[in-house]
Amino acid sequence: AALVAGMMEGAQKNGFETGGFDAYVSTNVIAAAGVSSSASFEMLICTIIDYFFNESKMSFNDYAKVGQYAENVYWDKASGMMDQMACAVGGPVLFDFADRDNLKYSKLDFPSENLDTDLLL
């Protein structure tokens, strides 16, 4: 519940509208295993906030800032924005962190189906 409260407050502090909602969430992402489970959940909550209350006007940078705020303030965790950006954009991504207020990113063309792997993270 604290993470959702942090997301709502973070969205408001970044100039976005919020409101109440009910959500049932189920996942196979392993919690606390270093696989961006919190960032994945944060991006889901941002998508809900964006779609239902902000006419889908939030950027991936906005999503990442809101998620970072929630982790920094409500979990007292020194979180950056990389996990949030990676989850928001999806797929292989190249980041440029030169301007931390407006991260730049490029989606990479990565033909994973041509690799002889069972699991690719």
Q: What spans do the regions from the language model cover?
A:
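ATP-dependent small-molecule kinase catalytic core of the GHMP/sugar-kinase superfamily
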Residues: 51-121
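Anion-binding (especially nucleotide phosphate/pyrophosphate-binding) glycine-rich loop
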Residues: 1-66
